[in-house]
From Swiss-Prot:
Transmembrane segments: none annotated. It comes from the Bacteria. The keyword Transferase applies. This is Porphobilinogen deaminase. Its EC number is 2.5.1.61. The gene is hemC. It comes from Rickettsia felis (strain ATCC VR-1525 / URRWXCal2).
């Protein structure tokens, strides 16, 4: 067993908090291992003035970190699973998942408590086409404008009235201790399905690194690992990018069965399809692929 681990992560406050959550899990099982955090600036962090879909998608938050992993400059990487594309380099693997935080979205607004309450033609700041699709479904009059940056910077922009409202993930707000019920309002799943993998912290390693695999096997939260399989299979089959409105949310019906709600839209968000699959744990990945095939056919009609 190794005595030291180099852990690659983005430099944002949220990324560092999430990395420390992983370290806490490692220390529970391997208290004598030294964990060194290696902050890495990614292309996604550097380019803030353009929508992700114009510059390469969420993979830009992983590119430099995964390269450091491939170059053996780090031993494992910590990501928000929602930023991980359906397909990753074949030499790498998502080997551990931490227990999922509440994956719901949050409506953040100083003067109103819901999207429905916003005045006519109000402006919502969001760069996610998934959120744009749901916003337009709820209120077609609203304007959605590009709104990037970390959680703190987005809330500051909201406070200075650059936009009327924004939408953020609850998990990030909670981990940063930035969820304020005075202006943060949870959005139910029935109104807005989460991003695939939202609320989940993922650990990525090299496929052939047995020492890291042993550690990941210990810290992996198996119920969550199984739960996100249909979501990830759906994403992988579609090979979706940041231009595609796509969402999925899985939950346990009982110890052996999973229900997954899927959403897929066309590029201009004018057509949105929903579908639900119920499957046992052993076939949940196949359910995600089945849903992707069926919904893709419906979208093309």
């Amino acid at each position: 067993m190794t005595n030291s681990i180099r852990i690659g992560t983005r430099k944002s406050p949220l990324a560092l908090i999430q990395t420390n959550l992983v370290i806490q899990q490692i220390k529970q099982f391997f208290p004598d291992i030294n964990c060194e955090i290696v902050p890495i600036i990614t292309s996604g962090d550097l380019i803030q003035n353009k929508p992700l879909y114009d510059i390469g998608g969420k993979a830009l938050f992983l590119k430099e970190i995964e390269q450091a992993l491939l170059d053996k400059k780090i031993d494992l990487a910590v990501h928000s699973l929602k930023d991980v594309p359906g397909r990753i380099p074949e030499e790498l693997v998502i080997a551990a998942i931490l227990e999922r935080e509440d994956p719901r979205d949050v409506f953040v607004c100083l003067n109103y408590k819901s999207i429905e309450e916003l005045p006519q033609n109000a402006v919502i700041g969001s760069s996610a086409v998934r959120r744009k699709a749901f916003i337009q479904k709820i209120r077609s009059d609203l304007k959605v404008t590009v709104f990037r940056g970390n959680i703190d910077s987005r809330i500051k922009k909201l406070m200075t009235a650059e936009v009327d409202a924004t939408i953020l993930a609850y998990a990030g707000l909670k981990r940063l201790r930035a969820f304020n019920p005075e202006y943060c309002h949870l959005i139910e799943y029935s109104q807005m399905l989460p991003c695939i993998g939202q609320g989940v912290i993922a650990v990525e390693i090299r496929q052939d690194d047995n020492a890291m695999l042993e550690i990941c096997n210990q810290i992996n939260h198996l119920p969550t690992f199984e739960l996100i399989k249909p979501e990830r299979a759906f994403l992988e089959y579609l090979d979706a990018n940041c231009r595609t409105p796509i969402a999925a949310y899985s939950k346990y019906l009982d110890a052996d069965n999973i229900q997954t709600d899927f959403m897929l839209g066309n590029l201009d968000c004018s057509k949105i399809i929903f579908h639900t699959e119920v499957t046992d744990i052993n076939t949940s990945k196949e359910a995600g692929i089945k849903a992707a095939k069926m919904m893709l056919n419906q979208l093309d009609k």
